[in-house]
């Protein structure tokens, strides 16, 4: 036996002793699927590594409870107090310590200085403190000389049912060690919480503050109570209430007419009979903290999964049968996954955060929601995403010396408890509902299914996902945050750019500083959209700096790599601009990604941690041969590093100036052009800079336009009328491949455009001609099919260039009249059109 365990233990020891200075994700992590047995072993060892944090965080109580039981508590910012921070932290960490003792012995290596006796002692003493300080037992007071928990509608505390659930799990893990008296205290606590659930109103609502999450945790306490005491005479009432809360967690308006019988094995109750009102918008999104919050969007699935888990695990372990079970706990979980989460899932399993976040970034807190759907709904997409997320949690833990899950936690030990809670639940769900026989989807086929541009109208968020990158932008009304970001289609490099919001804006837009004015933004036009396949165009308008400046902007997320940003900024009143910080992208300089970045730019290279702001003149910049920006602005800066929701973040300003500028009302402040690329080298970025052609010297006042290229040679035209009063005429620019054939008719090398204000015209093309006198147009805007007409007798032979998957293809043709040109089978096909 010892020989068999030795290789495993050596492997676990190596896993435990990785040091924080080592890079843990970029250039290290890959997307290979980890089998269930290995993942479960990793999850156990991750929790064992966390035991060092547990021991450091535990505090012995100065006095026992009133019946002489020794107790203690895991510390928080509110140690031993009766609030969420105090009670929830202790309950979660108690549960995790107890779990380790029950499930991990003989399978993991504990950190030096931590013993199984330590964990056993902490688990029991923290459980004693939890049940002793509840209002139902009153065996010991909390730090404020009071108690925690809910008893009835007349005496209740928000969220106490969630804390009670963790207490119940801790008790279950230690059930064989508890005396009958202690089990009685656990029962009194849980029955009191359930009494409140039986009396209270089931709340619903979706505007700004969904009740989905709250109803989910109310279902949890009913489930754990049922599972521990399934033969109690009150059990049928608990079960009925459990189903009501479950249906009204992910409740949707369509439920009112859903006459599906929930549990045919039990009775004929339908969804419609239990439905109280919607907690989700019509498109299955939700809001919490007054905005679209992807952490809350997913966590309800986790809560419902934890209820399913308790019913299965507790009842089968203690009583040998699952007396109580219900399909209500999976209600609409599949819909939320397919209609919302999958559209936001990134290459590392993270869910995109279009609005940024208001707690620690990159927690991968959706892992256990994926687990729920993988284990209980057998969802292959969820299984794949769970695998990615677990690997990222594992790697992030390596950035700490004490087994904590992350550095610079937003809420201290409480965050550690919540994260450990999720890791533990993921293990247990696989323990009771193995996925070993399932085949996960591969990420690239998954991405392709969810690649098309989508406007999430209820939240006013736009997104798409090409083979190169994910893009999103949000006009979140609740928190007045007008920002977005770009995530590379790469498991290890998609956190170079991070979600960021500040001063009502953030990534892409940035801000100006104006003397005597605040940095803020108020929307005038909250998104005019054009969607085409996996591409989108958005126009918007903001008044900024206490309505001193007007910024009209447009973003073209192309079907390829390039993301184009144009704007037109004017002064609304006389003012003094003291600083420009535009074209912003927040860049991680963090232990999780890279603590230093290498910046490549025109005639220069710099390695920096972003702490000091560095200014430089260059029409392009590349970060770590992975992310590039090109612009005609030539004035950039990088630095201003801050702790951005637990991730150290510097700022790349693609348009930067610290020079004072006095502006008159109506005067143009700037007409900026920036193009962003993902998964691109410095050399390619420099080449893209030479391909960028501005059209502003040809366009009327109030217009902005640019022609740019992708590394594969595809070209994109973007022309925006922001405030212009006249139509535009411009000459087709000559590129390195020739004169591009556009979606707009080109006559004699000139294009005429008429656009409304705050609108844009875009096209992508893979066809080029060598002579601007030819009349050209793409057929139905398709970049690979064109009509070309010769109208001059100057020459007979013309060259057509085409961008194909194999690269540039050329064809010289004898032109007479009009022809149809098409890229077909990686060749140029020419067909004469008879008039």
Annotate each predicted stretch with a short phrase.
Residues 16-20:
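Sec/Tat signal peptide C-region and signal peptidase I cleavage site
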Residues 661-686, 747-784, 815-835:
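C-terminal beta-strand-rich structural cap/linker in extracellular carbohydrate-active enzymes
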Residues 21-144, 256:
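Low-complexity, Ser/Thr/Pro/Gly-enriched N-terminal "stalk/linker" regions
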Residues 300, 306, 310-326, 346-729, ...:
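Extended polysaccharide-engagement surfaces of secreted carbohydrate-active enzymes
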Residues 7-15:
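Bacterial N-terminal signal peptides
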Residues 1-4:
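Positively charged n-region of N-terminal signal peptides that target proteins for export
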Residues 138-139, 150-172, 180-459:
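Extracellular polysaccharide-recognition and catalytic grooves
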Residues 587-611, 732-747, 797, 802-807, ...:
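Solvent-exposed beta-hairpin/edge-strand motifs
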């Amino acid at each position: 036996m010892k020989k068999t365990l030795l290789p495993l233990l050596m492997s676990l020891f190596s896993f435990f002793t990785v040091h924080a200075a080592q890079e843990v994700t970029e250039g290290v992590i890959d997307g290979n699927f980890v089998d269930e047995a290995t993942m479960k072993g990793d999850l156990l060892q991750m929790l064992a590594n966390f035991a060092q944090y547990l021991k450091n965080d535990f505090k012995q109580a100065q006095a026992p409870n009133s019946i002489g039981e020794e107790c203690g508590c895991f510390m928080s910012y509110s140690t031993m107090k009766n609030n969420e921070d105090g009670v929830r932290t202790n309950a979660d960490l108690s549960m995790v310590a107890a779990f380790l003792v029950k499930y991990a012995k003989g399978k993991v290596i504990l950190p030096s200085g931590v013993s199984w006796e330590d964990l056993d002692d902490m688990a029991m003493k923290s459980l004693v403190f939890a049940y002793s300080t509840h209002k139902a037992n009153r065996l010991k007071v909390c730090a404020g000389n009071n108690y925690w928990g809910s008893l009835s509608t007349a005496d209740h505390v928000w969220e106490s049912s969630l804390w009670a659930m963790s207490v119940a799990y801790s008790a279950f893990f230690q059930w064989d060690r508890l005396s009958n008296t202690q089990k009685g205290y656990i029962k009194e606590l849980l029955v009191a919480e359930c009494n409140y659930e039986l009396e209270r109103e089931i709340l619903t609502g979706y505007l700004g503050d969904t009740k989905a999450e709250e109803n989910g945790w109310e279902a949890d306490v009913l489930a754990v109570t049922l599972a521990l005491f399934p033969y109690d005479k009150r059990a049928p009432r608990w079960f009925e209430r459990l189903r009501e809360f479950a249906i009204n967690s992910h409740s949707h308006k369509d439920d009112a007419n859903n006459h599906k019988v929930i549990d045919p094995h039990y009775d004929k109750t339908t969804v419609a009979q239990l439905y109280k009102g919607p907690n989700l918008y019509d498109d299955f999104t939700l809001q919490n903290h007054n905005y679209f919050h992807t952490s809350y969007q997913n966590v309800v699935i986790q809560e419902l999964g934890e209820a399913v888990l308790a019913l299965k695990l507790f009842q089968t372990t203690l009583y040998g049968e699952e007396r109580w079970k219900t399909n209500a706990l999976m209600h609409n979980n599949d819909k939320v996954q397919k209609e919302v989460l999958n559209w936001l899932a990134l290459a590392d399993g993270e869910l995109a955060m279009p609005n940024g976040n208001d707690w620690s970034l990159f927690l991968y807190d959706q892992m256990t929601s994926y687990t729920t759907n993988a284990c209980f709904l057998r969802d292959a997409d969820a299984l794949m995403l769970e695998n990615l997320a677990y690997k990222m949690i594992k790697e992030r833990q390596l950035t700490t010396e004490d087994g904590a899950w992350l550095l610079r936690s937003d809420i201290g030990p409480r965050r550690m408890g919540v994260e450990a809670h999720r890791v533990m639940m993921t293990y247990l769900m696989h323990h009771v509902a193995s996925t070993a026989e399932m085949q996960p989807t591969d990420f690239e086929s998954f991405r392709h299914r969810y690649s098309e541009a989508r406007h999430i109208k209820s939240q006013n968020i736009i997104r798409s996902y090409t083979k190169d990158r994910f893009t999103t932008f949000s006009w979140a009304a609740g928190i007045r945050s007008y920002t977005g970001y770009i995530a590379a289609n790469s498991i290890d490099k998609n956190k170079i750019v991070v979600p960021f919001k500040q001063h009502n804006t953030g990534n892409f837009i940035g801000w100006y500083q104006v003397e005597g004015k605040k940095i803020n933004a108020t929307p005038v036009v909250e998104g005019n959209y054009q969607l085409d396949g996996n591409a989108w165009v958005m126009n918007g308008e903001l008044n900024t700096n206490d309505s001193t400046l007007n910024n009209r902007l447009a973003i073209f997320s192309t079907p390829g790599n390039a993301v184009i940003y144009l704007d037109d900024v004017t002064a609304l009143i006389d003012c003094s601009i003291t600083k420009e910080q535009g074209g912003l992208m927040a860049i991680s300089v963090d232990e999780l990604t890279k603590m230093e970045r290498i910046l490549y730019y025109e005639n220069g290279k710099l390695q920096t941690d972003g702490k000091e702001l560095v200014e430089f003149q260059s029409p392009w910049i590349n970060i770590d041969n992975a992310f590039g920006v090109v612009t005609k602005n030539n004035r950039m800066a990088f630095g201003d590093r801050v702790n951005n929701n637990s991730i150290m973040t510097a700022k790349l300003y693609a348009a930067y100036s610290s020079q004072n500028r006095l502006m008159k009302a109506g005067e143009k402040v700037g007409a900026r052009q920036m193009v962003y690329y993902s998964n691109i080298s410095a050399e390619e970025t420099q080449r893209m800079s030479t391909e960028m052609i501005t059209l502003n010297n040809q366009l009327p006042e109030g217009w902005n336009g640019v022609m740019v290229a992708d590394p594969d040679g595809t070209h994109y035209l973007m022309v925006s009328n922001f405030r212009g009063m006249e139509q535009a005429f411009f000459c087709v620019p000559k590129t390195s491949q020739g004169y591009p054939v556009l979606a707009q008719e080109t006559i004699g090398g000139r294009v005429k455009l008429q656009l409304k204000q705050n609108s844009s015209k875009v096209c992508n093309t893979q066809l080029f001609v060598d002579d601007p006198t030819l009349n050209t147009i793409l057929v139905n805007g398709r970049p690979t099919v064109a009509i070309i007409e010769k109208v001059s007798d100057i020459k007979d032979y013309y060259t057509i260039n085409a961008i194909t998957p194999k690269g540039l293809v050329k064809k010289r043709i004898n032109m007479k009249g009009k022809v149809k040109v098409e890229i077909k089978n990686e060749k140029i096909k020419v067909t004469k059109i008879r008039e």
